[in-house]
Amino acid sequence: MVRTLNNCPAPAKLNLFLHVTGRRADGYHLLQSVFQLIDRGDVLHFSVRDDGLIHRSTELAGVPADSDLVVRAARLLQTEAKKQGKTPGADIAIEKKLPMGGGLGGGSSDAATTLLALNHLWQTGLTRAELMALGLQLGADVPFFLFGQNAFAEGIGEALMAVKTPESWFLVIEPGVSVPTQQIFSSLELTRDTKPVKISDFSRAQESFGKNDLQVVAANLFPPIADAIKWLQQFGDARMTGSGACVFCPFKEEQQVDAVLATVPQQWKAWKAKAITHHPLAYLAT
């Protein structure tokens, strides 16, 4: 039995567009978006424990272990393992490379990687669909990272269809603020009635398609986001990902990204990333 899985990637995502099309009776917003995986993310390391403990060995500022999605994901899967008569534990270390509150799905991706890795190590044998159902209990973005490939998302973000996206490089700016998602979705300024689109609409247009309905609200509340968008728009179709704060712009060639990256004002952290088609750990689930 394999007892360790090291260097497990938890890739970030970008929302190529994000439309808010309505609101459910329970308060959840109805969304349409294309989720794009990129080759930058956090890295996690897992070791099996025999005492049933779930232990996060990495200290994360502002994130107590008990509320960390990684620990919650492990405990959720552990509950499934116990139904099979197993009481496995795990040591989990996290190399955090993505910012908190960045709109890159970092915490959700970490949770998905945890479910994929521990499902393999603990030999719980859950299918991809079963893992996605567990993931939805943790957050609306988690199922996407378990889905395993770029997706057109609807509902609260959990209804997913595979979609082909352009081969792109991205320049991503971290404006230096952390955006509380709930603050954006609860804003009275938020547009909640964007006309629904079809996956074929995106597939035909792709580049510069749609917008991010959350961007206006976030940019008004957090001026550094507005500043980053304005600066990056000199070079192309810059927009915010998720509920912010990160801002990105697509480029066709790596050399184009490098040229712009060299000119980013020093007050911002910026980096480049390549679009990828599949989650690096997609092979762990069927």
Swiss-Prot record:
Stated name of the protein: 4-diphosphocytidyl-2-C-methyl-D-erythritol kinase
Organism the protein comes from: Herminiimonas arsenicoxydans
Role according to the record: Catalyzes the phosphorylation of the position 2 hydroxy group of 4-diphosphocytidyl-2C-methyl-D-erythritol.
Recorded name of the encoding gene: ispE
Sequence similarity: Belongs to the GHMP kinase family. IspE subfamily.
GO MF annotations in UniProt: 4-(cytidine 5'-diphospho)-2-C-methyl-D-erythritol kinase activity; ATP binding
This protein's record includes keyword tRNA processing: no
Binding residues annotated for ATP, in chain numbering: P99, M100, G101, G102, G103, L104, G105, G106, G107, S108, S109
InterPro entries listed in its UniProt record: GHMP_kinase_C_dom, GHMP_kinase_C_sf, GHMP_kinase_N_dom, IspE, Ribosomal_Su5_D2-typ_SF, Ribsml_uS5_D2-typ_fold_subgr
One BP annotation, GO: terpenoid biosynthetic process
HAMAP family according to UniProt: IspE (MF_00061)
SUPFAM superfamilies per UniProt: GHMP Kinase, C-terminal domain, Ribosomal protein S5 domain 2-like
Enzymatic reactions: 4-CDP-2-C-methyl-D-erythritol + ATP = 4-CDP-2-C-methyl-D-erythritol 2-phosphate + ADP + H(+)
Pfam families: GHMP_kinases_C, GHMP_kinases_N
Record-listed E.C. numbers: 2.7.1.148
Active-site annotation: K13, D141
NCBIfam families tied to this protein: ispE, PRK14608.1
Pathway(s) it belongs to: Isoprenoid biosynthesis; isopentenyl diphosphate biosynthesis via DXP pathway; isopentenyl diphosphate from 1-deoxy-D-xylulose 5-phosphate: step 3/6
Domain of life of the source: Bacteria
Keywords for the protein's UniProt record, in alphabetical order: ATP-binding, Isoprene biosynthesis, Kinase, Nucleotide-binding, Transferase
